[in-house]
């Protein structure tokens, strides 16, 4: 057997031809990855998928197959769908927390001053590179304060003052919650927490 064969040919115990369809994507150092693919999908099925694609499309297909195989190995029932649902639930919870925070900010600084957050655009190489969150986390951590404010489109207000005011407001609400009439003397006779705001309330809050 050729000592420089790819991991696919090593697993299948065959000679690695110069034009081997697996060689560009499964070097010998990637043996564990192909073993997983072979175990989950079968080497023959992987070959058929790659053979029916243009060479420029194969790297994306290999990345997708590897991701799906790893997901199915971790969760044989749901696979990638289970991962998708997990992160979808996390995003929904974060969305509820953001809306709750917006409500609190609107009560303190006014609805017009609530920051409007922009989404981070998907990188152009997102589908061609092996998926990992670490590079994007490192990029976020490397931003300075000006870049962070530009990304989030923050208004020209002191964020620390807002946070301090929010916690002070929360403290007052907790204190008032146990003293009934002692809290009735607010300006205008209406508590800020009683205002009707356009953001959905988070019913999971204690």
From Swiss-Prot:
Recorded superkingdom: Eukaryota
Domain LOB: 4-105
Region (Disordered): 184-206
Family per record: Belongs to the LOB domain-containing protein family.
Protein name: LOB domain-containing protein 35
The organism of origin for this protein: Arabidopsis thaliana
Gene designation: LBD35
């Amino acid at each position: 057997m050729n000592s420089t064969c790819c991991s696919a040919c090593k697993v299948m115990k065959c000679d690695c031809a110069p034009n081997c369809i697996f060689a560009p994507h499964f070097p010998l150092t990637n043996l564990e990855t192909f073993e997983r693919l072979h175990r989950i999908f079968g080497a023959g099925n992987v070959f058929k998928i790659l053979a029916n694609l243009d060479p420029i499309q194969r790297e994306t297909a290999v990345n997708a197959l590897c991701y799906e195989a790893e997901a199915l190995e971790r969760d044989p029932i749901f696979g990638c769908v289970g991962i998708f649902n997990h992160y979808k639930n996390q995003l929904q919870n974060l969305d509820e927390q953001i809306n709750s925070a917006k409500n609190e900010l609107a009560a303190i600084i006014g609805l017009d001053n609530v920051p409007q957050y922009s989404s981070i655009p998907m990188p152009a190489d997102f589908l061609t590179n092996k998926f990992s969150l670490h590079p994007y986390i490192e990029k976020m951590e490397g931003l300075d304060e000006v870049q962070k404010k530009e990304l989030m489109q923050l208004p020209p207000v002191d964020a620390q003052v807002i946070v301090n005011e929010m916690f002070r407001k929360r403290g007052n609400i907790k204190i008032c919650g146990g003293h009934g009439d002692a809290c009735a003397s607010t300006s205008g006779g209406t508590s800020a927490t009683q205002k009707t705001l356009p953001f959905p309330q988070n019913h999971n809050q204690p």
